[in-house]
Structure formats: C-alpha cells, structure tokens
Amino acid sequence: MGTAYLSPEPGGKSFVAPGDKVAAGQTLLIVEAMKVMNAIAAPRAGTVKALLVENGQPVEYDQPLAVVE
C-alpha cells in the first residue's frame, strides 16, 4: 500500500497526461510507500490513454495505475 503522486513535487507539473507519447522506462508517476518514493515507469513506448489514479490517492499492490497503448 502507498500513495500515488502524479508530479515530482507538490504543485509541480505532472509527469504525464492522457494523450502524451512516452518512451519505455519513462516515469509516469511515483508511489510513496514507507517514506520511500518509487518511480512507476512505462512498460513500453506508446501513448498514455488514461491515468487510473488521482494525485494523493492511496493505492494497493497490483492495482492498475495507468493505461499505455
């Protein structure tokens, strides 16, 4: 369990938005768990179709966070 953040700092620009093209390994968002920030990377190059979480939302292990096609 952790907390999802869509930008690198409070009030900052989001890592990505729906419609953005991303490269494999590019950071989509971060999840804070036990005070450690974990970057969540795009599994492949493509287009961000949706972000399935909101900024500051609690998330669970194996929960879908974004759609990249």
Language model features: what each stretch is:
Residues 1-69:
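Structured functional modules or segments
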